Amino acid sequence: MLTAALILCSSDGAESAKKAPAQWVPLKGCRFMTEEASDGDSFHVKFGQREFIFRLYFVDAPETDEKLTDRIEEQCEYFGVTMKEHRKAAAAAKQFTTEWLKTPFLVTTRWQNALGRSRLPRYYALIETSGHDLAEALVQRGLARAKGTVAILPDGTKAKDHMAKLKQIEAEARAKRVGIWADSKFGGK
């Protein structure tokens, strides 16, 4: 917590995103902020007096911003769904994340720049509530896929091993036809 406080209190705390990723920093006592631009894998968080946007490592949820047509088309192709089915899944992923973050949660970040078009910088993070990983929960419910920026986890788990675990969870969600997979033309392959 002291490390987090030092980073946040320094004049260049947000600037650290321009540098190589640093040590993992746990941010306890974060609060979810309702924002129109939030979706299943990217959202606004209040920590102390500061507001941040965090983007989940390892996963990609259906986009809610309909201006991102190329990404939405690629996601529709991957999941085997129509635009209408994609919109439904994007809303479900956003709702799930909103509900998940109503309970106390832990943000763990290295302040790695996740890019974005917002007024605030966006950083990659891992999010946990009661020891459960949000990214894993999204994939398990068919509300995201295993894809995206990866990192060695704070416990030392290799990124490729964690991604393999998420890919397996995704395959199980697809086979069970949950979430977006319920509407997929690919069936339970």
What are these model-derived regions, one by one?
Residues 1-7:
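Bacterial N-terminal signal peptides
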Residues 8-189:
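Small beta-barrel nucleic-acid-binding modules, primarily SNase/OB-fold domains
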